[in-house]
Amino acid sequence: MNSVKCEIKKLIIPTYPEPSAEELPMFAENRVHQRTSGRPYPNKVVLKVNREEKIDKEYTAVVLENEYLKIEILPEIGGRIYSALDKTTGYDFFYKQHVIKPALIGVLGSWISGGVEFNWPFHHRASGFMPCDFVTETLPDGTAVC
């Protein structure tokens, strides 16, 4: 395997479902998030966590793989790199969460630890727990890009 291959697959991950968001987000303007605050409107804010119910949830994963690495990306959770496996050693070189258990750390509430998230314009961005779009393409040389 000399090039990067791309596969879309389903992963079942035990998940604590996200509670309903605040219906009046303008009242969450004074919520302090890691020494930052702001106006979330028109976005809704999750102000609580669910610890009573855990379900097996199916996630779409974009898997990029070559002979050395296997990278799993979860577009449904902000496009976060869920796992990165060094195939030569069998070592996951980012922390891989085995349970999705949101905490109230994100700008709009829900955030999970593990993997790698895209952080812009600052840490734990507003869309870090929101679904994102993705496109995969195979280049003329057979290399996959996402």
What are these regions (language model features)?
Residues 64-67, 86:
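Active-site beta-strand termini and strand-to-loop segments that position acidic
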Residues 1-20:
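Intrinsically disordered, low-structural-confidence terminal and linker regions
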Residues 62, 81-84:
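N-terminal localization/anchoring segments of enzymes in phospholipid and broader phosphate metabolism
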Residues 69-72, 78-82, 89-92:
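Primarily extracytoplasmic ectodomains and periplasmic/lumenal surface modules that are beta-strand-rich
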Residues 76-78, 87, 98-100, 123, ...:
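Beta-hairpin (beta-strand-turn-beta-strand) motif
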Residues 10-15, 74-81, 98-102:
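A short, sequence-level motif marking secondary-structure junctions
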Residues 26-65, 113-146:
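Extended, loop-rich substrate-binding clefts of extracytoplasmic carbohydrate-active enzymes
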Residues 88-107:
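Active-site-surrounding "flap" and adjacent substrate/cofactor-binding loops of secreted or lumenal enzymes
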